[in-house]
A protein has these predicted regions:
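Conserved N-terminal catalytic core of the sugar/cofactor nucleotidyltransferase
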Residues: 2, 10, 24, 28-110, ...
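Short N-terminal binding/cap micro-motifs at the start of the first secondary-structure element
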Residues: 8-12, 146
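Conserved core of the sugar-phosphate nucleotidyltransferase
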Residues: 61, 116-149
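Short alpha-helical oligomerization interface
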Residues: 16-20
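The conserved beta1-alpha1 loop
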Residues: 5
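Short secondary-structure boundary/capping segments
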Residues: 13-14, 68, 99, 125-128, ...
């Protein structure tokens, strides 16, 4: 699941008319970076929650997102908070609303963060899925531009 429902307040005025996951970095929308990273690890099913200007995201990505010749297309489904509730539900509410559409084991990642070096690997997912753990938090170092976090 990729979280993509937030208002993007710190990015205003850019997010006044564009949802933050569609802002481009290096010629690609922010949401495309985790989609490509997941596709590179063999994941072909992704649920995206939407909120602020949420209709823009399925309009841009559709239900099948092709990555060119590199990987198979990613099948996309959407949890449309803005459509059903009139607003985004915050992180926990968005996850709770999406649970019926998710598998018993799933990854949750931000869909509006530039992360070109996506740190997860399919082997990590498979190891977690085989474990008795209920959740796993993946900690990553603070980026050089924000060393205090």
């Amino acid at each position: 699941m990729l979280l993509a429902a937030g208002r993007g307040k710190r990015m205003r005025p850019l997010t006044n008319a564009t949802p933050k996951p569609l802002l481009e970095v290096h010629g690609k929308p922010l949401l495309e970076w985790p989609l490509r990273a997941l596709a590179a690890q063999g994941f072909t099913q992704v649920l995206v929650n939407t909120g602020w200007l949420g209709a823009h995201i399925p309009a841009r990505f559709g239900t099948s997102y092709a990555h060119g010749d590199a990987w198979p297309a990613t099948h996309l489904r959407y949890s449309r908070e803005e459509q059903d509730f009139g607003h985004a539900l915050e992180t926990a509410g968005g996850i709770a609303r999406a649970l019926p559409q998710l598998d018993a084991v799933f990854w949750l990642a931000a869909g509006d963060v530039y992360a070109p070096d996506f740190a997860f690997a399919r082997a990590d997912y498979d190891r977690f899925a085989a474990s008795p753990a209920l959740a796993h938090i993946w900690l990553v170092p603070n980026p050089p531009h924000n060393p205090a976090g």
